[in-house]
């Protein structure tokens, strides 16, 4: 009798439908997801706050540099006597300089600028001094200790590194480089940045074995003519040297030309620059084909 009552009670209990079961599971999963998302969000906020404070602590060096001091440091070209760096029209100073190794827009063939921006910083005229994506890629390769070239530094960053900071590979130096690069973009025009960079950057060695810096010195030393007369092939070759000047230079320490197989390394780099110029539509297919046929070794200066 008792057993029969229990069965009757069970039969009269409301049955849970599939929909109700699904709703119960859904609510539980929803609470778990909200809890997980809340914890994740709080963790990210904490990490962001820590990162901001850490970044501020390691960029104090850049905060102590005034705008005027930073501008003068960025523009300073060692060994120049006739440049008035306080002149707000610094490109005019470069154009009118009595020193043939200091050049401005009127003294530099536009192919050099095209080669430089196409191969080293294709977004130069659009960014504000840094490229977040390239920077993250560089950091990732640094963390995983890979040797592949990242292209993480813009021309502005390279100017800051050469003129204001050192070449040491520390996170402090890199952080200050980022801050100063963004400030540099507010103090100088794009043309002031790129022509100053071309006037100070190292290009390896000349045919006497001496170290050379600046596009004018490189143009005279390698091809025996001013940068205003450099053709597309020569422009690509000179700019190709910038990634690793003493590796790609065609000259040995005594100024003698390297063996053909070593000179070819620099020519291969030149072909890369030409391809980048074609991809970025800085040159036509015909100009690319003609430049690839140009005999660089035949035109190099020798003793």
Residue ranges and their predicted role:
Residues 2-303:
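Juxtamembrane regions of bacterial inner-membrane/periplasmic proteins
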